[in-house]
Design a protein with these regions (language model features):
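Re-entrant/interfacial helical elements at transmembrane boundaries that shape
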Residues: 63-74, 91, 102-116, 240-242, ...
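Juxtamembrane helix-boundary/capping and inter-helix hinge elements in multi-pass membrane proteins
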Residues: 7, 80-84, 109-121, 234-237, ...
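Transmembrane alpha-helix boundary signature
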Residues: 17-34, 59-62, 83, 199
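Hydrophobic alpha-helical transmembrane segments of multi-pass integral membrane proteins
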Residues: 14-17, 39-71, 92, 245-285, ...
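Single conserved hydrophobic/aromatic residue that forms the stacking wall/gate
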Residues: 1-13
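Membrane-interfacial loop-to-helix junctions in multi-pass transporters
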Residues: 6-7, 33-50, 76-86, 155-163, ...
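Flexible hinge motifs at transmembrane-helix junctions and intramembrane kinks/re-entrant loops
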Residues: 163-195, 202, 356-357
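Juxtamembrane and boundary regions of transmembrane helices in multi-pass small-molecule transporters
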Residues: 92-95, 99-156, 160, 170, ...
Length: 363
């Protein structure tokens, strides 16, 4: 329960930052900054890269999809590309950051349940999924290389409004405590918002509170899930699952496959990768300790394979949101979701060709 409270407190601060930076105009400026950098022949691949940047900065796949879906529709209308491939690029980029961002609720849940540092998990995770991201860029570029796109709408941006995201991203990368980073981001967002005229002094607490209230549903669900997991553990359910998994695996490689499959299938059942990590985290922790799996890798595989599941199931929030915003069906978008599938392939290859490294100290 104490770990759950710490995790939810961190998520609430994350969403306070999200509320503050959105009100300060940070989302619009970040999107426009990315769009202004897209070469004309690189429109769809550029959507993927912008989605990666925004989702890593914002820590939310849903927010990324909401911000970029209208732009994807516009690019589709002006180039003749199928809207499914344009929104597919957005969803792929959103899932990249959902897995990697150090202020994502999935990352917070993964590192807290496995007992490792965020920056260590990021480094281990990043080098596993980097080939998937590069291949995805090449696929989108090759599929759309014969079309040009010229953005006619206003894409004005302010680097001051992007500053809070950069502070949070760089602060997290160099290893500053996540609470310090997020609180700094909130303060900078409020200063920028007030100075730019986006936030009135009387609205400062309101915009921060709006971010916190967005956490209500996931907080309640996480508490209920944690209680259920504790009851299951008390009555021997987790031990039963552990014994079942242990009987099927042998050594570290088998343990990592067990963690990956467990994470994927639980996400497929819950359709929520944060909830799936909260549920499978204690079991993955037991497996990693039993078979001496590096906690950085167990956290990475938990986060990766729940993201793989979340990125391809037609009833997941990300695909449902993308479909609603574009008037498509999830099944029309799924064939263009190259990144989640490639991330899964890279994860499997990372397990098969795992490096022989010493186990790190558990925090």
């Amino acid at each position: 329960l104490h770990r759950l409270i710490r995790r939810q407190r961190q998520m609430c601060i994350r969403d306070s930052f999200s509320g503050a930076v959105t009100a300060a105009g940070g989302v619009d400026s970040t999107v426009n900054l990315g769009l202004s950098l897209i070469p004309a022949h690189f429109a769809v691949a550029g959507l993927f890269l912008i989605g990666c940047f925004i989702s890593v900065s914002m820590g939310t796949s849903m927010g990324t999809i909401a911000a970029l879906a209208p732009i994807a529709v516009g690019i589709s209308e002006k180039t003749g590309f199928a809207p499914s491939i344009c929104i597919g690029a957005v969803v792929c980029g959103a899932m990249f950051g959902d897995n990697l961002s150090m202020i994502s609720d999935t990352t917070i849940a993964a590192v807290k349940t496995q007992g490792c540092e965020m920056k260590d998990k990021f480094k281990a995770n990043f080098f596993i999924v980097l080939p998937a991201a590069i291949i995805t860029v090449l696929i989108f570029w090759f599929a759309t290389r014969n079309m040009n796109f010229h953005l006619e709408e206003n894409v004005s941006y302010s680097l001051w409004e992007v500053l809070p995201y950069m502070v949070v991203l760089l602060g997290a990368l160099i290893g500053i405590n996540v609470f310090v980073v997020l609180i700094s981001g909130i303060v900078i967002s409020l200063i920028v918002g007030v100075s730019m005229g986006h936030i009135a002094l009387s609205e400062m607490f309101q915009v921060v509170g709006n971010g916190v209230t967005s956490m209500y549903d996931i907080t309640v669900i996480s508490i209920i899930v944690a209680c259920i997991v504790s009851l299951v553990k008390e009555h021997g359910g987790i031990q039963f699952i552990l014994n079942l998994i242990k009987s099927k695996i042998n050594g570290r490689r088998g343990a990592e496959f067990g963690i990956a499959l467990l994470a994927f299938f639980v996400d497929a059942c819950t359709a929520n990768n944060t909830v799936a990590i909260v549920m499978t985290g204690p079991i993955a922790k037991e497996i990693s300790e039993e078979f001496d799996v590096d906690p950085r890798r167990s956290a990475s595989f938990l986060d990766m394979f729940t993201s793989v599941g979340q990125g391809i199931i037609p009833y997941g929030a990300q695909l449902l949101s993308a479909a609603t915003l574009t008037g498509l069906t999830p099944l029309q978008i799924i064939p263009n979701l190259y990144y989640p599938l490639l991330m899964g392939v890279c994860g499997v290859l990372a397990i098969i060709f795992r490096p022989q490294s010493k186990k790190t100290t558990v925090k």
